[in-house]
């Protein structure tokens, strides 16, 4: 249901990006999946219905009761479990999940260097993590490098956005993850265009849509990245998270 998806997406159509991730990740019936920053659970519901997996859907801002209503509407109450949690304060045991996904939200909590080993602890060795998010075509290191069209909202919308190369280096730094795939998604131009058109049609203001409309040099893009959990042990005493 296209209208249901739009209604339950925070920003662009979340399933466009999730489907791109599913092209390069393997999900099997009965797997335990963690959906980080699930928003209004559209992604978690899709995974449960499409692949028969169990999904722990966490978000810091959307209430579990609100998400549970959506889950019941789609008859997924026995396979999608909504929780209100900070991504840096998770209660799960080590090696609990077969896969971790994050669609359009990882950059809000995953740029901390300590977060990579922290989140990796919840994956079984050999398990996979996959994200889809916004990136820059080149790294912006100084405020003077920020394009004019982006400067008004840079400090609240863009300063934590990085290049694909930056993300690649972050994930391999501690040896707990082995990169399987890191690239701009094939649907990049289509999804960006749809995002701009959706907000133009709705006549709502959105800083990201406004920036995309003015980005003539292709600075802003959407990437997908997957990695496999290595066998390397994780000593969490070295990776205490600050929340």
What are the language-model segments listed below?
Residues 34-36, 40-89:
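Class I SAM-dependent methyltransferase SAM/SAH-binding core
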Residues 88-100:
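A short acidic, Gly/Pro-enriched loop at the edge of an enzyme's catalytic core
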Residues 99-111:
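A short SAM/SAH-binding and catalytic strip from SAM-dependent methyltransferases
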Residues 113-128:
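A short glycine-rich, Lys/Arg-flanked "PGG" loop and its adjoining helix->strand segment in the class I
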Residues 134-157:
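Short, glycine-/aromatic-enriched active-site segment of Class I SAM-dependent methyltransferases
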Residues 159-175:
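Short alpha-helix
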Residues 181-243:
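Conserved Class I S-adenosyl-L-methionine
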